[in-house]
């Protein structure tokens, strides 16, 4: 399965940190965190199949567990990395948890930032909840500076994701619009997760943190933050005045959460 990554490092001897983006996103969603993260890690920002620079094949298995196995295989076989810390956001957070389940000897810790998959039941849906944002992205990619300045358009694209949508920088919006508009893997990856939930077993030796914002409108507490579905040894953290894409709202705090989880494994 073709995944790709962008590597950032000051020292290749620093422990590996794998970053996994969500549906319709790309590895560059993490770039505001990279300058701080490379002080402690060699960072590998993954592009999932059909997202960012990664190609999409017709025979892809796009469910979260298969994607998790593909990332581990890529890191071990292609990049030569035997042990790694992992962080993921949204569907990427679910995939990160699955990585710990499929490869507990390779994955030392997981920081799951607003992970999908933690619900009692997820009946199949006909359309993904972010479909309107994808349609808008396909249109607005051609006039992004203008769209960014029009509050109504910016609200359509981001109000479901964050109550702090007015504060998003042009760079963050530009990168996310391009990633969403051009993600050939958007629908295949959504179909791979649709109707499923996280049900895997993660050994206690893999350190886990599950982090949600208290203003998450995409995966709200009453629907999609079921502690009993997460591994029982997870450290559960709620961030005040924070929405679904935690690294947009609080990049420095996100870095600290990742570092603290990694330290638990040392």
Regions found by a protein language model. Give the residues of each.
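Catalytic histidine-centered segment of alpha/beta-hydrolase-like enzymes
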Residues: 242-255
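Gly/Ala-rich beta-loop-alpha elbow adjacent to hydrolase catalytic centers
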Residues: 88, 92, 96
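Conserved acidic catalytic loop of the alpha/beta-hydrolase fold
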Residues: 66-84
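Conserved HGGG/HGGXW glycine-rich cap/lid loop of the alpha/beta-hydrolase fold
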Residues: 7-55
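Conserved serine/cysteine hydrolase catalytic core
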Residues: 182-229
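Conserved alpha/beta-hydrolase catalytic His-Asp/Glu region
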Residues: 145-202
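Flexible "cap/lid" loop of the alpha/beta hydrolase fold
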Residues: 101, 110-142
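Residue in the alpha/beta-hydrolase core beta-strand immediately N-terminal to the catalytic nucleophile
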Residues: 47, 85, 108-111
């Amino acid at each position: 399965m073709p995944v790709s990554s962008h590597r950032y490092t000051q020292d290749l001897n620093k422990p590996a940190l794998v970053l996994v983006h969500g549906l319709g996103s790309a590895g560059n969603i993490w770039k505001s965190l990279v300058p701080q993260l490379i002080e402690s890690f060699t960072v590998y920002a993954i592009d999932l199949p059909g997202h960012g620079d990664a190609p999409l094949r017709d025979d892809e298995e796009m469910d979260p567990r298969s994607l998790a196995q593909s990332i581990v295989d890529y890191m071990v076989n292609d990049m030569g990395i035997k042990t790694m810390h992992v962080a993921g956001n949204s569907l990427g957070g679910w995939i990160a948890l699955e990585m710990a389940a499929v490869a507990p000897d390779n994955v030392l810790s997981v920081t799951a930032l607003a992970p999908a998959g933690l619900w009692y039941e997820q009946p199949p849906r006909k359309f993904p909840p972010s479909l309107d944002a994808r349609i808008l992205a396909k249109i607005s990619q051609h006039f992004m500076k203008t769209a960014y300045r029009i509050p109504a358009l910016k609200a359509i694209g981001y109000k479901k994701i964050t109550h702090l949508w007015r504060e998003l920088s042009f760079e963050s919006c530009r990168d996310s619009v391009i990633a969403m508009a051009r993600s050939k893997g958007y629908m295949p990856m959504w179909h791979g997760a649709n109707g499923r939930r996280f049900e895997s077993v993660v050994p206690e030796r893999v350190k886990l943190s599950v982090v949600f914002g208290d203003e998450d409108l995409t995966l709200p507490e009453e629907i999609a933050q079921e502690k009993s579905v997460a591994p029982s040894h997870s450290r559960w953290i709620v961030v005040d005045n924070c929405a679904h894409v935690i690294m947009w709202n609080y990049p420095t705090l996100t870095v600290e959460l990742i570092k603290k989880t990694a330290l638990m494994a040392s």
